[in-house]
Structures are given as structure tokens and as C-alpha cells.
């Protein structure tokens, strides 16, 4: 039975990843910040672990709990949009977005990626097309854009570090999805996005290590 790790599974894309992988017979390890969310994930059949991605001690504790695991696929989903205005960001707003979207990845990927080496597994982060510099046509959401561009950089560093060990690391844009962040007017349901993301990750080959991909598997400019 293959094993998948989903970091940030309390709702939205992460929660649907748990549901779909379990439906396909995978063993699922999933994290959430609140115990109530962990209890719900456990009811779906996942091994649920509490994790606050903004807390270094919590991340270190996760590493201990995952010791000796061999994982076939891992998804880093946890993220926040931050302020909807494009004015002067406060220090608190900056820290919330950058700590959640960037610093967490810098701390988590070195813990998670080695667990994929034995299986020559695949590690994916949920980024956003808004983080693309080459395709940027609007300055809206500047703090979120900056955080996702930085996340993509962290992903490439992981690809360079762990690719030689057989791990394939990729960054995905999930599409405009009907989640709390995307809103009800988004073009994709959570089910549609996750179905495509899973299929695209399954199709990724090691030669694509370090790629930035759309949910349908097509490349996105950095």
C-alpha cells in the first residue's frame, strides 16, 4: 500500500487530497493545526498528526513522529493569502504570510524529502500562478505573489538538494479553486482541482524535477 503525506489537510485542497487518496486505497498521513480537525481526518482513515507550520518546535516534533516512515508522495498544502489590500503591509501581515508560505517550507522540506528517497517518491508544493514573474500581468495581491515566488525558489533548492537522491520535487498551481481563499466564483471545484493535481503528479517523471506546473501538468513560466 503506497503512503502519502499531506501537510495542511484541515480543509479545501488538503482535505480533498486526503479523501481522494483514501478512496484509492492509499495509506494517508495528514496534518492539521487543531485537534478537532485531526479527529475528523482520523475518521476518514488517515493517520492524523497535529502540526502548526509556523512553529519550529511543532515542525521538529513532526520530524520525530515521521521517523522511519517511507513515503511515496508528499504534498505541502498549508498556506495563507494575507491582506486583500495592496497598501503598505504591516510587519504582522508580512510575517504571517511569509512564515506560513515560505519559512514553513524551508523548515519542512528538508525533513520530508529524505523520507521519499527510498521510494524514489515525489514531493509537491501548492504554489500559485500568481507567483510567476514571467507571466505577471497585475500587481494585485503583491504580498501573496511575493510569498509564492519565494516558495518556488525554496522548491527549486529542494529539487537540487534531493533530486540526486531520487526525489522528484515540483511546484503546482492548483487553478482558481472554490475554496475559502478562491471564493465561490472560482472556475474549478475542489474535487476537479485535486483530481487533476493527483493525476499530474502521478505522471511527473524525474526529468521534470524542479518544474513549475499547472494543475493539468502543463509548465508555467517562472
Label for each model-derived stretch:
Residues 6-7, 76-77, 122-128, 168-173:
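Structural signature of the Rossmann-like NAD(P)-dependent dehydrogenase/reductase core
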Residues 164, 171-174, 183-222:
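C-terminal helical subdomain
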Residues 53-69:
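Conserved Rossmann-fold cofactor-binding substructure of NAD(P)-dependent oxidoreductases
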Residues 10-22:
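N-terminal Rossmann NAD(P)H-binding glycine-rich loop of SDR-like oxidoreductase domains
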Residues 43-57:
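Rossmann-fold cofactor-recognition segment
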Residues 80-98, 106-107, 120-163:
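Catalytic loop of short-chain dehydrogenase/reductase
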Residues 24-39:
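Conserved glycine-rich Rossmann-like NAD(P)H-binding loop of the short-chain dehydrogenase/reductase
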Amino acid at each position: 500500500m503506497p503512503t502519502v503525506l499531506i501537510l495542511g489537510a484541515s480543509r479545501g485542497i488538503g482535505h480533498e487530497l486526503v479523501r481522494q487518496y483514501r478512496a484509492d486505497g492509499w495509506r494517508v498521513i495528514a496534518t492539521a493545526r487543531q485537534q478537532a480537525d485531526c479527529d475528523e481526518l482520523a475518521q476518514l482513515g488517515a493517520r492524523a498528526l497535529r502540526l502548526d507550520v509556523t512553529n519550529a518546535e511543532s515542525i521538529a516534533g513532526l520530524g520525530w513522529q515521521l521517523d522511519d516512515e517511507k513515503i511515496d508522495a508528499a504534498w505541502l498544502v498549508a498556506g495563507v493569502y494575507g491582506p486583500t489590500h495592496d497598501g503598505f503591509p504591516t510587519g504582522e501581515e508580512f510575517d504571517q504570510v511569509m512564515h506560513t508560505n515560505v519559512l514553513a517550507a524551508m523548515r519542512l522540506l528538508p525533513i520530508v524529502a529524505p523520507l521519499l528517497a527510498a521510494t524514489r517518491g515525489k514531493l509537491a508544493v501548492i504554489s500559485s500562478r500568481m507567483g510567476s514573474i514571467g507571466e505577471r500581468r497585475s500587481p494585485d495581491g503583491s504580498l501573496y505573489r511575493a510569498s509564492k515566488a519565494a516558495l518556488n525558489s525554496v522548491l527549486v533548492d529542494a529539487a537540487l538538494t534531493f533530486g540526486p537522491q531520487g526525489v522528484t520535487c515540483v511546484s503546482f498551481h492548483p487553478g482558481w479553486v472554490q475554496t475559502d481563499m478562491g471564493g465561490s466564483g472560482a472556475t474549478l471545484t475542489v474535487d476537479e482541482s485535486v483530481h487533476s493535481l493527483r493525476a499530474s503528479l502521478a505522471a511527473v517523471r524525474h526529468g521534470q524535477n524542479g518544474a513549475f506546473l499547472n494543475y493539468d501538468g502543463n509548465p508555467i513560466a517562472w
